[in-house]
């Protein structure tokens, strides 16, 4: 199991939202590239980047920032947020992104997801963002008619092997992860699941280590690292088995 630090981008700046709400935004006085380098130096093996502008509006002003992050670090970078056309997918692949995370199109345009899988199956992951078990789309502002588990089974049939599961109610809240729902998704589907949302401190990582060993591929943490609730080096040691 690996600990994956997150960088959320809005207006070329590092931010965190609480429960995905634009109005509940915290800005951090560090450049995205500087933060990525700090994460790499602490021992991260993968960085998770979310383009919030594109998620909300479909337009991105963060492309150059993402390019700079990839240019400056030597570890893989996965990117998500509002990728709803094949051109955006190609652009990110050409940039050197290790994995592109799509969400909304898995619900609204499965044909496009098929096209992406045909282009480069290994570079596609699906983000399943759920509130009370129901999948939310378009930057979490709309609800869908899919239960999280049903969507996971559907994309698995299409050939997706990796999903990022976020419990929206926990995201950016520092209230602790939804262990049960995430584990159920991983065990029932057999997919490679990355857990996201709610990490509040090292105790949550110890719990993931205890419950998720050989079931969960990775855990994403953002706000807890930025606000000093988790020392990234120590978190990596706990989750990856050195303490």
Swiss-Prot record:
Highest taxon in the source lineage: Bacteria
One of the Pfam families matching this protein, by short name: His_biosynth
GO molecular function: 1-(5-phosphoribosyl)-5-[(5-phosphoribosylamino)methylideneamino]imidazole-4-carboxamide isomerase activity
Family, similarity comment: Belongs to the HisA/HisF family.
Places the protein is found: Cytoplasm
Upper lineage: Bacteria, Bacillati, Bacillota, Clostridia, Thermoanaerobacterales
Protein name per UniProt: 1-(5-phosphoribosyl)-5-[(5-phosphoribosylamino)methylideneamino] imidazole-4-carboxamide isomerase
Enzyme Commission designation: 5.3.1.16
Main location class: cytoplasm
Pathway: Amino-acid biosynthesis; L-histidine biosynthesis; L-histidine from 5-phospho-alpha-D-ribose 1-diphosphate: step 4/9
GO biological process: L-histidine biosynthetic process; L-tryptophan biosynthetic process
Enzyme class at the top of the EC tree: isomerase
Entry-linked NCBIfam families: 1-(5-phosphoribosyl)-5-[(5-phosphoribosylamino)methylideneamino]imidazole-4-carboxamide isomerase
Entry annotation: catalytic residues: 8, 129
Keywords: Amino-acid biosynthesis, Cytoplasm, Histidine biosynthesis, Isomerase
Example of a GO cellular component annotation carried by this entry: cytoplasm
Catalytic reaction list: 1-(5-phospho-beta-D-ribosyl)-5-[(5-phospho-beta-D-ribosylamino)methylideneamino]imidazole-4-carboxamide = 5-[(5-phospho-1-deoxy-D-ribulos-1-ylimino)methylamino]-1-(5-phospho-beta-D-ribosyl)imidazole-4-carboxamide
